[in-house]
Amino acid sequence: MKLRLSALALGTTLLVGCASSGTDQQGRSDPLEGFNRTMYNFNFNVLDPYIVRPVAVAWRDYVPQPARNGLSNFTGNLEEPAVMVNYFLQGDPYQGMVHFTRFFLNTILGMGGFIDVAGMANPKLQRTEPHRFGSTLGHYGVGYGPYVQLPFYGSFTLRDDGGDMADGFYPVLSWLTWPMSVGKWTLEGIETRAQLLDSDGLLRQSSDPYIMVREAYFQRHDFIANGGELKPQENPNAQAIQDDLKDIDSE
């Protein structure tokens, strides 16, 4: 099963090749760049090659694709009520009801969310990148705040990563115990890293991998906050990239 999530993971990596390295767009700032580069070197030159990447390779090579899809569907289904609320907060009740329908159908008919029944039944109900509370803040023009590279976590901003904590107050996420939340986060992280294994070469070939990772973070969250659209004034190749993402989604 090919998800828009996978398209975005690839697309946001490709976006950086033509993105500006400036940090004054849409409230971006990187006042701790020296510290962040040190943390980046730890995360991506120590933690990733010796721990994260080997786990992701084993996950990709030894876990059957149907099992991976099922676990991804299940963890994604847990977020559907929060996504619904965020769309309502953004003034988009139609998309809010789409995600309510996804949650209802997949929970009742899809074995608690392991099977994406809604997406298979109707193309308009296919899974998309989740809109979290940080995306809602971005939708209303709230700036990111300082960009930080955290050890064991990676890119962090107060708006998107801190703001997303608000989603934990909505059911079903509010029902998860701390170990359950950590397990969900770990599964999602391993799956995302496994999807990006084929893009490792792009990072290695970059003249400044830190800038590439930082700009990929901003581009991805801009894309989500803007409703899945790229603004041409911020990226002259926005329309071409938008078309490529649509082609990937249609496969």
Swiss-Prot record:
Gene Ontology annotations for the cellular component aspect, listed alphabetically: cell outer membrane
Disulfide bonds: none
Disordered: annotated span: 228-251
A Pfam family recorded for this sequence: MlaA
Lipidation residue positions, type N-palmitoyl cysteine: 18
Gene Ontology annotations of biological process type: intermembrane phospholipid transfer
Chain segments annotated as transmembrane: none
Subcellular location field: Cell outer membrane
Signal peptide (residue range): 1-17
Main subcellular localisation: membrane
Family membership: Belongs to the MlaA family.
Function noted in UniProt: Involved in a phospholipid transport pathway that maintains lipid asymmetry in the outer membrane by retrograde trafficking of phospholipids from the outer membrane to the inner membrane.
Annotated protein name in UniProt: Intermembrane phospholipid transport system lipoprotein MlaA
Gene that specifies this protein: mlaA
